[in-house]
Amino acid sequence: SWRDSIGDFSYGAKFVLSDDQQVITNYPNDSKSLDIAHYSGKKLNSIWGYTTVGIAQSQEEMDAHIANNRPSWGSNWSAGDIMYADLNGDGVVNSGANTVDNPGDRTIIGNSTPRYKFGLTLDAAWKGIDFSVFFQGVGKRDYWLSGPYFWGASGGMWQSAGFKQHWDFWRPEGDPLGANLNAYYPRASFDGTKNQYVQSGYLQNAAYIRMKNIQLGYTLPKQWVSKAGMSSVRVYVSGDNLLTISDITGIFDPETLGGAWG
């Protein structure tokens, strides 16, 4: 923290930073099965997932890809679908034995523990006028979002959502809505959730900085308020959560994300 003054002008700053990680040293899961939530040596909140190659731009590209990288789930893979990477070179994309030692083509792609949590307060005052602003945030955090609120089109009409962000889905040349080959989301489909497996390409960067509060006030001179029988009067305007900087999709609030993954 810091505080100083120059004549009638005073100012100050306060910064708080914290960080923590947790590792499980011993857990009754000798096989280190990933079907069980925890295992010895696990860094808490690790996110296991597949590696995203990209969105197939043509049927030919998808056919060539799945010839050597065929997912063990889903069918009718086509242009606009996700291409997953076969990391172990066996020609199939799967979770192997689903253990730490044999996770197939999954790896630890992130961690949802909030890291480098911080708060910054700045304030100043001059001849009865005061100003303060408070920022808070998280310096590093990965987060996996799932379900229709993130993906939009999902397992069926009644399991889907339609926010403006979801319009950025892949569309081919000649589509009535216009082509969108550089889309964020894969093609819209009610055909299951084969494009929505936990994967690197859609892992969210949940780090953020938010202006939690900003306030401007004025304390009336004592000679004014004493005539009304009062000792002090301060008038002020205040605003909360007026600015947030984050890479996470705008559908979600990085400060109020649910429980940690893993």
Each language-model region and where it sits:
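Membrane-embedded beta-strand positions in outer-membrane beta-barrel channels/transporters
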Residues: 1, 12-14, 119-121, 213-217
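Conserved small-residue
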Residues: 2-111, 152, 168-176
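Outer-envelope beta-barrel architecture signal
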Residues: 7-13, 116-118, 127-129, 207, ...
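Outer-membrane beta-barrel proteins
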Residues: 7-10, 22-28, 140-146, 156-157, ...
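Membrane-embedded beta-strand positions of outer-membrane beta-barrel proteins
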Residues: 13-15, 133, 235-237
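Transmembrane beta-strands of outer-membrane beta-barrel pores
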Residues: 17-23, 126-128, 137-141, 213, ...
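Repeated loop/turn-to-beta-strand initiation elements of outer-membrane beta-barrel proteins
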Residues: 128-132, 223-224
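Extracytoplasmic gating/loop element in the C-terminal half of outer-membrane beta-barrel translocons
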Residues: 138-234, 238-240
